[in-house]
From Swiss-Prot:
It is found in: Cell inner membrane. One of its GO terms (biological process) is amino acid transmembrane transport. Belongs to the amino acid/polyamine transporter 2 family. Mtr/TnaB/TyrP permease subfamily. It comes from Haemophilus influenzae (strain ATCC 51907 / DSM 11121 / KW20 / Rd). It is a multi-pass membrane protein. This is Tyrosine-specific transport system 2. Gene3D superfamilies: Amino acid/polyamine transporter I. PANTHER family: LOW AFFINITY TRYPTOPHAN PERMEASE-RELATED, TYROSINE-SPECIFIC TRANSPORT SYSTEM. Keywords: Amino-acid transport, Cell inner membrane, Cell membrane, Membrane, Symport, Transmembrane, Transmembrane helix, Transport. The chain crosses the membrane at residues 7-27, 38-58, 83-103, 119-139, 150-170, 183-203, 219-239, 279-299, 314-334, 335-355, 376-396. Transports tyrosine across the cytoplasmic membrane. The transport system is energized by the proton motive force. Disulfide bonds: none annotated. The lineage of its organism: Bacteria, Pseudomonadati, Pseudomonadota, Gammaproteobacteria, Pasteurellales. Its main location: membrane.
Length: 406
């Protein structure tokens, strides 16, 4: 099975999907209750699997197996399509990297307290996190690959250990808690959406599978089922162990990843369990940060080269790291906010774009062998949901929806 390309592609999709977004889930769903959290997760999973399968449909018309999404956008919408696809992906990666830097700084700032020392300044921690880990990205793929291999194994071990410690402490009463405000379910949607954003690797998977529609479909279904299962168990553990009222109270005082660690420690009475959650959170966040920043770094390199702009390592380093670092320094507790706006961009790239491409593909190629079920009705419904998700961060900002933690 390990040599099976379909299974290998499924693991690539799962690895891309599972990242720091799952760390935000307990923070954003603290006031929602486990039942509605489960419904939101399953609903968004189904929606993004659907949009992923739309890419499979569209890739039947690709001129080359490794054509990128931007190339397909140019094929059907001209140069403006390529520009929109490229910019939306780049800004999405910037928003994610800003979220990861703020989250990493939050965890690092609280680390000295584990050794009985005073907490580090949040802004200092943010700078240290960015400089130390960013150096691996500047070195290139080899630097990231070597570090990620070690950290990924550590992340799996830490996650298994967290579940081993938390699941036996799950209380049924905690799982039965109802939302403090049902509108929280809507407010959390963009943040949860980023946890299923595997669409950035569609070209690589299509090329690896030789353009096989059947293998591509199965890779998406298997590859997304793995993170869905992991997310459900993670939410079962956090919602089942952490009392809703106490969890919300602690997060109101510290709505960051460090607050999640503190909540785990205070509610369970176990300092050790709190630090295990910190270790897992740190590893998950670091691996996500490295992957996203490598994407930003290499994407900018290609963009600068295409338009004959200076693309030496120094210029690329400044262009890649300065925007998210500035956001993190001016808004050091903005982990959830950055993820929320990343969700807006994710909704465009992972929903609006594939729906638009599929619509044009069906008009120009009405006899393709594979077409996703649901017809145009499903396209319109998914499009409307995508537009609503894109509006949610603004509705929160304008006061029409409640703010989730962070």
């Amino acid at each position: 099975m390990l040599k099976n390309k379909t299974f290998g592609s499924a693991l690539i999709i799962a690895g891309t999907t599972i990242g720091a977004g799952m760390l935000a889930m307990p923070l954003t769903s603290a006031g929602m209750g486990f039942g509605y959290t489960l419904l939101l997760l399953v609903g968004l999973w189904a929606l993004l699997v659907y949009s992923g399968l739309l890419f499979v449909e569209v890739y039947q018309t690709a001129d080359q197996l490794d054509d990128g999404v931007a190339t397909l956008a140019e094929k059907y919408f001209g140069v403006p399509g390529r520009i929109f696809a490229t910019l939306s992906l780049l800004v999405l990666l910037y928003a994610l990297s800003a979220a990861y830097i703020t989250g990493g700084g939050s965890l690092l700032s609280g680390l000295p307290t584990a050794f009985g020392m005073e907490a580090m300044s949040l802004k200092t921690a943010i700078i240290i996190f960015t400089v130390v880990l960013g150096s691996f990205v500047v070195v290139g793929t080899k630097g990231v690959d070597g570090l990620t291999r070690v950290l990924f194994i550590g992340k799996l071990i830490a996650f298994a250990f967290v579940l081993f410690m938390m699941l036996p402490k799950v209380a049924t009463d905690n799982l039965m808690a109802l939302p403090l405000d049902y509108a929280f379910v809507v407010s959390a949607a963009p943040i949860f959406l980023t946890s299923f954003g595997f669409h950035v690797i569609m070209a690589s998977v299509n090329s690896y599978l030789g353009g096989s529609v059947d293998k591509f479909r199965r890779a998406i279904l298997i590859g997304t089922a793995i993170p869905l299962a992991a997310y459900l168990v993670w939410q079962l553990a956090t919602h089942g162990v952490l009392s809703q009222s106490e969890f919300v109270r602690i997060l109101q005082a510290d709505p960051t990843l460090n607050g999640l660690v503190n909540a785990t420690r205070e509610i369970t009475g176990s300092h050790f369990m709190g630090e295990v959650v910190r270790v897992f959170s740190s590893l998950a966040l670091i691996t996500s940060f490295l992957g996203v920043m490598l994407g930003v770094f290499e994407g900018l390199g290609d963009l600068f080269k295409r338009y004959h702009l200076p693309n030496n390592r120094f210029v690329l380093t400044i262009a890649a790291f300065l925007p998210p670092l500035v956001f993190a320094l001016f808004y050091p507790e903005g982990f959830i906010t950055a993820l929320s706006y990343a969700g807006l961009l994710c909704a465009f790239y992972c929903l609006i774009l594939p729906i638009s491409l599929a619509w044009r593909t069906r008009i120009e190629n009405p006899t393709l062998p594979y077409r996703v079920a649901g017809g145009n009705f499903a396209l319109v419904l998914a499009l409307l949901i995508g537009v609503v998700i894109m509006l949610i961060p603004f509705l929160i900002q304008w006061g029409y929806l409640p703010v989730v933690a962070g």
